[in-house]
């Protein structure tokens, strides 16, 4: 374990004293450091009446138990403080460590001992080996009582709300859209978990089309075949118009208003970051949206109709939209329990809707936590004029996702009434996505949130993984960079895949979110400042660093060679079938120079931190009138790399007081032969830009530019980078087995590493 403490807020000695005393620690400004430390440690043993016995079972140094130390005349030193602090944090001498000084240094222990009360204050805010901060662990053990009111420590809310006596209610919010065109504005089901209190509370809202269930069997039947020819597209320029996202004014006329919801529930799937804040006084709201189980409308998959339907929930929390107690629309109900302040949460599609909602500029949305979210749906299913499936899901497209999330059809009565119209709508959508050409068009433009980034007013927190080939890093990169310069924004860029990071051992992500939420939603003047970019260093385990930005303008140019080299697109049928059946076998062969590719190795002559988009400038020609180029950059070398999927550790993370406990996680540092740094794909007909389609003349040289997926990665001098240039990618692109070649003039081609 390493300490990476970004949530702690430095305080004055007076504040440290006051907060310690308010929690029941009997420290004194007049007492010695040793006396205060003894009082602090004895308080830790909440379940012991005879704390002498507990102290005898801990040690102050290898020769002295802690009780004997406190009874002696010896002063408190940094060495004793450090050894006892380790035991307070759950580390066991002679098991987890033998040399406490070396162990503390190795773990980057964040507290510089000076004997002050600030040391004890910061120790409470430090994570234990179990993943909980020491103060959260003690509160879970009833250090302070459940009060159903806010208690803050170090600018963060503590788990003082009763999660056994929550309001669990359902309402149906009226949206400004009629997506199924039945003449009625669509209602969306809203599932609410909130503290049982008599004062207004803010809310964490998760907009998830998956929340009420999915239709996987029907979606699987629509999965597209990836084998086929790369078509020649007619040359031309694509024209677009700016989408209109203004909603009509809501009808706020009450209808037989009531103050109590008539529908409740026993269980719903939850997100543990929401659970964590629910125990700390923030309501938790889940909305599936239009076209889902027990909501109305059709699944419009990423357009602003879907977004405005989610926005209506925030409007309802602020008195700007109506909600009904049931879909019969007989009684309206207001959110009289809500303060109106909201943050959105969730990963993938959920993070996508966070991005989209932010671009509406809706009042009340104070903060957005967008984890691995899409910012432009074209960049999820397409790339540079090509069909490019999300990593791990070849053959998926927006129509299959629409079918997957259209859970309204899981209700047999709804299926009976609406399926015919829905299937007609789905056929229109399947045509509009244009799998035939793979081009950007108005359909995709209507699902591009980046163009409205200037409307974002909320504080934005992004998380994204460098190894996320599902929602690829271009999505966070372009949104992060498009936001107004005056806006507060933050990015946690880790080395994982498409994964949550709130339960990781190495970083206090959820505590950082607690501090921000208290500041933005509860109005707490805690002075908290989160760095703009927090990056997980790829060179060692559990190491995080602060960076100034994502994307740098400096570039290191690497000439690719001195000759020409060719890529054969065609494979023997047996090999082609093998790769199509198991794309991982293709990747294994590709990276080991056993597939059809140009493989180039470069030894770095300097340390460098790649930050941004690796750019390829290639002089190429195709033997036919079409073609695609794919590229991947890897670090080669048999050594330890961070694996992309977190390993589960012990079930020790408590989100309240024995509430929604979950497993601690961390990316393992494992031996491997290589690490993918970045990748990219380009249709040669889109070599100028995304909106320009040009002819490819057989055997005529072209100069193309290809920006690969943005990343942050640090190799050292002497490390070997491998650039692989190829055509068909069996995981991502169309699988065209035509017999043609792409030739690259390496002497006129280069790779630029941004830093």
Swiss-Prot record:
InterPro entries: AB_hydrolase_fold, Galactose-bd-like_sf, Pept_S15_Xpro, PepX_N_dom, PepX_N_dom_sf, Xaa-Pro-like_dom, Xaa-Pro_dipept_C. It catalyses: Hydrolyzes Xaa-Pro-|- bonds to release unblocked, N-terminal dipeptides from substrates including Ala-Pro-|-p-nitroanilide and (sequentially) Tyr-Pro-|-Phe-Pro-|-Gly-Pro-|-Ile. Homodimer. One of its GO terms (cellular component) is cytoplasm. One of its GO terms (molecular function) is dipeptidyl-peptidase activity. Its EC number is 3.4.14.11. Removes N-terminal dipeptides sequentially from polypeptides having unsubstituted N-termini provided that the penultimate residue is proline. The active site is at 348 (charge relay system), 468 (charge relay system), 498 (charge relay system). Keywords: Aminopeptidase, Cytoplasm, Hydrolase, Protease, Serine protease. Disulfide bonds: none annotated. It is found in: Cytoplasm. NCBIfam families: PRK05371.1-4. It comes from Streptococcus thermophilus. Gene3D superfamilies: 1.10.246.70, alpha/beta hydrolase (3.40.50.1820), Galactose-binding domain-like (2.60.120.260). This is Xaa-Pro dipeptidyl-peptidase. GO terms for biological process: proteolysis. Belongs to the peptidase S15 family.
């Amino acid at each position: 374990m390493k300490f990476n403490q970004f949530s702690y807020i430095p305080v004055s000695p007076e504040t440290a004293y006051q907060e310690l005393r308010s929690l029941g620690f009997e420290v004194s400004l007049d007492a010695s450091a040793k006396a205060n430390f003894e009082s602090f440690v004895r308080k830790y043993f909440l379940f012991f009446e005879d704390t002498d016995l507990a102290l005898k079972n801990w040690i102050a140094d290898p020769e002295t138990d802690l009780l004997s130390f406190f009874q002696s005349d010896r002063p408190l030193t940094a060495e004793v403080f450090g050894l006892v602090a380790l035991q307070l944090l759950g580390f066991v001498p002679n098991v987890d460590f033998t040399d406490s000084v070396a162990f503390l240094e190795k773990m980057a222990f964040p507290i510089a001992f000076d004997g002050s009360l600030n040391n004890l204050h910061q120790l409470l805010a430090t994570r234990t080996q179990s993943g909980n901060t020491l103060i959260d662990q003690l509160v879970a053990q009833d250090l302070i009582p459940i009060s159903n009111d806010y208690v803050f420590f170090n600018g963060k809310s503590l788990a003082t709300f009763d999660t056994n006596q929550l309001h669990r209610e359902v309402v149906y919010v009226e949206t400004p859209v009629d997506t199924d065109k039945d003449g009625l504005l669509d209602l969306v089901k809203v599932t609410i978990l909130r503290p049982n209190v008599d004062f207004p509370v803010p809310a964490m809202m998760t907009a998830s089309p998956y929340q009420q269930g999915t239709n996987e069997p029907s979606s699987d039947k629509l999965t597209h075949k990836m084998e086929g020819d790369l078509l020649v597209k007619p040359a031309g320029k694509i024209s677009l118009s700016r989408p209109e996202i203004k909603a009509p004014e809501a009808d706020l006329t009450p209808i037989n208003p009531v103050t109590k919801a008539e529908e409740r529930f026993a269980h719903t799937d939850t997100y543990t970051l929401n659970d964590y804040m629910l125990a700390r006084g923030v309501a938790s709201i889940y909305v599936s949206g239009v076209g889902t189980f027990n909501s109305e409308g059709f699944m419009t998959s990423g357009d602003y109709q879907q977004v405005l339907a989610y926005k209506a929930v925030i409007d309802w929390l602020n008195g700007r939209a109506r909600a009904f107690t049931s879909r019969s629309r007989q009684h309206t109900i207001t959110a009289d329990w809500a303060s109106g302040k909201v943050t959105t949460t969730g990963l993938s599609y959920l993070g996508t809707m966070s991005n989209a909602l932010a671009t509406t500029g809706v009042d009340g949305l104070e903060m957005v936590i967008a984890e691995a979210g899409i910012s432009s749906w074209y960049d999820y299913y397409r790339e540079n004029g090509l069909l490019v499936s999300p990593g791990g899901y070849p053959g998926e497209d927006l129509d299959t996702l629409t079918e997957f999330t259209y859970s309204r059809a899981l209700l047999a009565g709804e299926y009976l009434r609406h399926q015919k119209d829905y299937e007609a709508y789905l056929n229109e959508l399947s045509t509009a996505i244009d799998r035939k050409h793979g081009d950007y068009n108005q359909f995709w433009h209507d699902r591009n949130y980046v163009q409205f980034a200037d409307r974002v007013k909320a504080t934005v927190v992004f998380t994204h993984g460098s190894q996320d080939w599902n929602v690829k890093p271009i999505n966070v990169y372009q949104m992060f960079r498009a936001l107004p310069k005056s806006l507060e924004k933050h990015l946690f860029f880790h080395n994982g895949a498409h994964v949550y990071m709130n339960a990781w051992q190495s970083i206090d992500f959820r505590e950082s979110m607690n501090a921000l939420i208290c500041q933005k939603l509860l109005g707490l003047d805690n002075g908290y400042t989160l760095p703009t970019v927090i990056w997980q260093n790829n060179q060692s385990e559990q190491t995080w660093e602060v960076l100034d930005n994502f994307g740098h303008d400096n570039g290191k140019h690497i000439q690719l060679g001195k000759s020409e080299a060719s890529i054969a697109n065609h494979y023997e049928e047996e090999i082609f079938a093998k790769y199509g059946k198991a794309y991982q076998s293709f990747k294994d062969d590709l990276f080991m120079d056993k597939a059809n590719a140009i493989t180039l190795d470069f030894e770095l002559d300097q340390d460098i931190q790649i930050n941004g988009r690796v750019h390829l400038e290639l002089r190429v020609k195709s033997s036919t009138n079409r073609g695609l180029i794919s590229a991947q950059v890897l670090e080669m070398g048999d050594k330890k790399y961070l694996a992309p999927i977190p390993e589960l550790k012990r079930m020790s993370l408590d989100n309240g007081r024995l509430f929604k406990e979950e497993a601690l996680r961390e990316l393992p540092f494992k031996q491997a032969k290589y690490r993918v740094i970045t990748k990219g794909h380009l249709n040669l007909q889109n070599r100028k830009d995304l909106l320009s389609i040009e002819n490819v003349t057989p055997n005529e040289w072209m100069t193309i530019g290809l920006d690969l997926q943005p990343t942050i990665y640090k190799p050292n001098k002497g490390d070997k980078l491998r650039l692989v240039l190829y055509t068909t990618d069996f995981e991502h692109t169309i699988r065209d087995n035509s017999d043609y070649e792409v030739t690259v003039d390496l002497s006129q081609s280069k790779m630029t590493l941004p830093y």
